């Protein structure tokens, strides 16, 4: 739409193909689309978050789209060039590295519910929610509360986020899942960011996620 919100990657243009994660033997880079052909590259020494990053200081570079990908001009001897599915990283005091795009997924994505689990939603009906509505794509519409109440429990939730490159912070696909009506687990696009308590997976105002796994 005019605000730059997309539900389908095919409609999002080339920026959606450039945004993502790139991995090498000793470095990981997350590239964030910022709209209007602009990007930010976040360089992690050791590997991607949750996959080798040493949790040290990150290096950030600003760049722009080219006819073949994106270029991030040199800053403090670091530079990035993306061509297709490959990222060329210039590293100070070392040989340049070639990183390839990776598509990480949660190991629990699509997993079967364990024995004895209560399935609240499987895409067939929304009877376990009030009000409960299903979108034309078979997803549970936001604004629904479970009919049943729970105390101590483990909840498995799968969700998708729209691609909103021009939005920033809490305006980037912001939503949440309330537990017991009081603890809000953040659901928003915080890809490439620090991972604070108001970002994806954080318990709002209470606890930051152990690792930012917004993929």
Descriptions of predicted regions:
Residues 1-7, 25-28:
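Charged, amphipathic alpha-helical segments
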Residues 3-9, 14-16, 34-38, 42-215:
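Carbohydrate-interacting regions of secretory-pathway proteins
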Residues 16-20, 27-28:
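Mature N-terminal, pre-catalytic/accessory segment of carbohydrate-active enzymes
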């Amino acid at each position: 739409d005019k605000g730059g919100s997309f539900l389908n990657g095919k409609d999002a243009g080339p920026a959606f193909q450039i945004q993502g994660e790139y991995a090498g033997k000793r470095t990981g880079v997350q590239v964030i689309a910022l709209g209007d052909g602009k990007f930010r590259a976040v360089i992690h020494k050791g590997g991607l978050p949750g996959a080798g990053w040493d949790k040290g200081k990150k290096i950030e570079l600003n760049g722009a789209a080219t006819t073949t990908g994106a270029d991030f001009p040199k800053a403090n001897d670091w530079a990035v060039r993306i061509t297709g599915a490959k990222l060329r990283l210039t590293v100070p005091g070392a040989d340049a590295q070639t990183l390839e795009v990776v598509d990480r997924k949660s190991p629990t994505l699509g997993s079967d519910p364990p024995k004895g689990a209560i399935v609240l939603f499987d895409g067939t009906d929304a009877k376990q929610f009030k009000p409960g509505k299903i979108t034309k794509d078979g997803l549970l519409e936001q604004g629904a509360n479970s009919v049943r109440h729970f105390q101590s429990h483990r909840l498995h939730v799968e969700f998708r986020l729209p691609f909103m490159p021009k939005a920033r912070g809490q305006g980037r696909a912001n939503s949440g899942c309330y537990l017991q009506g009081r603890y809000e687990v953040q659901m928003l696009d915080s890809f490439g960011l620090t991972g604070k308590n108001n970002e994806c997976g954080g318990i709002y105002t209470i606890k930051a996620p152990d690792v930012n796994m917004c993929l």
